[in-house]
């Protein structure tokens, strides 16, 4: 989940489709999960599990999904722009797990696609890939070809796979699934399970209502503009990110 649909609408829609829970993973923000925690949790939908995650925008590895243990709060995970190598160290130092989202998706947003265009990063990425805990191998907004490549990547490094709907719009909710035991009721449960499970069943159906489906070749202009937006956003948050990073280094790294 990283769209603008209200979080309770996600829950209602997923429950109607037979889902028992979801991972909330907004881009560089926990606002969606906060809405659940502050306004809904304990009051409604107590038969539905909502877990906390984030889709972090790195400066060199595209989008990375991050899940931290219950109670761990790091402001830096809402300040986009860290290098992938630093993000891995921070997440693991605090007991979390992480993995690339849609690794063969759009350039600048996806780990492999980003770095295929930057030969100087290839060795760095080769060193980084084994350190991830999982790979998103099915994304409902990606093609069968790119999802197949992501699955082969996970198999190469013996990593479990996740499925994600990447639902920015209401009609995309529930297009993908990840099969998990009913015993997983918290982030800690999920982290422990992923660390000990080499294979996780996941999949879904392709969603053909994405922006790139609707505007065709013009989508490349949008993707290129994202590159400049990402650079500006990273620079804007540089001071805050540096301050948070120094604090983490003193405590953990």
PLM region spans:
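An N-terminally biased module of ancient metal coordination in phosphate/nucleic-acid-related enzymes
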Residues: 1-59, 81, 248-252
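Domain-core and long-helix interface of multi-subunit machines
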Residues: 1-2, 71-175, 214-217
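Short, hinge-like loop/turn segments at secondary-structure boundaries
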Residues: 39-43, 67-70, 115-119, 178-182
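Beta-strand-turn-beta hairpins that frame and shape the catalytic cleft
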Residues: 46, 59-64, 93-96
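Short, basic, helix/turn surface patches
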Residues: 48-57, 129-134, 185-200
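Short glycine-enriched loops at secondary-structure junctions
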Residues: 54-60, 104, 167
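A basic- and aromatic-enriched beta-loop-alpha substructure that forms the phosphate/nucleotide-
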Residues: 57-74
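C-terminal functional module detector
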Residues: 87-96, 149-160, 165-253
């Amino acid at each position: 989940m990283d769209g603008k649909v209200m979080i309770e609408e996600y829950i209602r829609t997923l429950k109607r489709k037979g889902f028992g829970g979801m991972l909330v993973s907004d881009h560089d923000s926990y606002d969606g999960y906060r809405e659940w925690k502050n306004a809904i949790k304990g009051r409604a939908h107590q038969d539905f599990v909502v877990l906390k995650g984030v889709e972090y925008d790195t400066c060199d590895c595209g989008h990375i999904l991050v899940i931290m243990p219950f109670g761990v709060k790091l402001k830096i995970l809402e300040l986009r722009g860290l290098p992938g190598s630093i993000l891995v160290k921070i997440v693991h130092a605090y007991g979390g797990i992480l993995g690339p989202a849609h690794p063969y998706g759009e350039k600048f947003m996806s780990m492999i696609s980003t770095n295929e265009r930057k030969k100087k990063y290839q060795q760095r990425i080769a060193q980084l890939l084994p350190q991830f805990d999982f790979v998103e191998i099915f994304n409902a907004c990606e093609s069968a070809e790119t999802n197949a490549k992501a699955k082969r990547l996970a198999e190469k490094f013996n990593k479990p796979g996740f499925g994600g709907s990447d639902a920015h719009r209401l009609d995309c909710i529930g297009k993908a699934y990840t099969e998990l035991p009913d015993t997983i009721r918290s982030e800690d449960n999920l982290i422990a399970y992923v660390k000990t499970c080499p294979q996780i069943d996941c999949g879904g159906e392709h969603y053909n209502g994405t922006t790139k489906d609707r505007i065709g070749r013009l989508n490349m202009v949008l993707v290129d503009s994202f590159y400049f937006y990402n650079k500006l956003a990273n620079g804007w948050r540089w001071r805050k990110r540096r301050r948070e990073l120094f604090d983490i280094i003193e405590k953990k790294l």
